[in-house]
């Protein structure tokens, strides 16, 4: 997974509130000693009370509302949280599990804060799951109530009458009723006691290789992560995040929501990727939280816009050359003023997670003046455990462990590659109702991630791939698919790739399923004049074969891709755009 934040930001207006990141301590001889002093919190209650009392007049959330834009201050959020808590208590839900499901919006965030800070256990659900899956998860989690957004009604039709259904469209009514109860003396929020170390958040993993499991996190798990990330990467009260990724994933929830709420910053909600460009201009974010596939497509769009301009490629090359001569992000953003304006004019940081970002996109964004920070984590680690920070960034690794988090490489081979294990306050309580699965991954307090990694000479870490996706050849040699995909996806003729071991005549063959970049292929084929469909297909195969041959040259012979599949349809993915490797492998082998 991947993180980003940086303090090189020039505000449009100087904020009235004092920045509470009061001091930076850095030992220049040891990147791992880079820390900020920040307030300690151990629960979402601490987070909610602290931020709402410290930054009452700051904008907490901003979003489209009809034809206009609505802003909600921290003071207003606090009033809504207390009122909604009173309402939920009146339904007998204290200490119960309450699910939240739907698109990113204020009501989703309000439900999360209210349940965690003043009611019970929150269960974020993926709105894109089937009705059967949602029914199963609600039953499995023993959810007592579900707050759902518009568009999710049909998936809840078969949910039993024992589960209270609360459409988010009725939120104004719930809050009004809660305020009435409070006016009569109800103090359910204030009287509720939060145990920071008990189950507080139940998250069902989407998984890329297997069945979903319920990850049990305590509020202290999440809050330790918020604090430890803030110690490495500064977020200020005048910052604004543009939230695009689904909030039910702990990555977006922690990095794109709670971390900004902790700092008194604001969160803007994007309702649709079709509106992404317009939302950049409308909301003017300083930070963009995204995944590689989204960032790479956005970067490709920017470069292609230049290419279509008269002399655009030359202009881009000259601007990049100028950019290399200056180190300050602000100066680089002025050189690329057109790009900067199209992204709202205030963007200076990009948070990228879930997989590795291509070197081309990484260096491209850096040349534009945006600070790109990379990190790693899983739902089970709340989620971040290793990351870049304000003292260190690189395109070649995932950075250093967070303060308070220990990592080790288990059973490394001759190249130093082994399974990454993590120990710290961010490690989950276990898998819900699944002690066997818990025992398989948590041993002696260490969480075994299932990811292969190595420690580099400078002390930073690099992820090599997943153990479950690793290809083991007949001679015992091992191939990491992600390593090959990394270089394939870097080529302009490749939109996306999936590498796996295909069983053929009793042997395992390294196989690459590749989705060509249609625009780049079409542009290349224009050079050959008019072509029949068959000729176009053959030329496309030749181009992709050449790309694979070039990538094969970067590796030892045993790692070379031996079989190529030209893919015409999209890969099966999770809602964070990660390829579901097991499903894809089974599909390709049918």
Briefly describe each language-model feature range.
Residues 57-105, 109-113, 130-135, 219-220:
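Conserved AMP-binding/adenylate-forming core of the ANL superfamily
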Residues 7, 151-196, 302-338, 568:
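ANL superfamily adenylate-forming
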Residues 471, 498-500, 546-590:
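Conserved C-terminal "lid"/linker of ANL adenylate-forming enzymes
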Residues 56-59, 182-204, 211, 234-240:
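Conserved pre-ATP/AMP-binding loop-to-beta segment of ANL
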Residues 129, 424, 429-430, 452-555:
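AMP-binding/adenylate-forming catalytic core of the ANL superfamily
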Residues 71-75, 200-226:
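Conserved AMP-binding A3 loop
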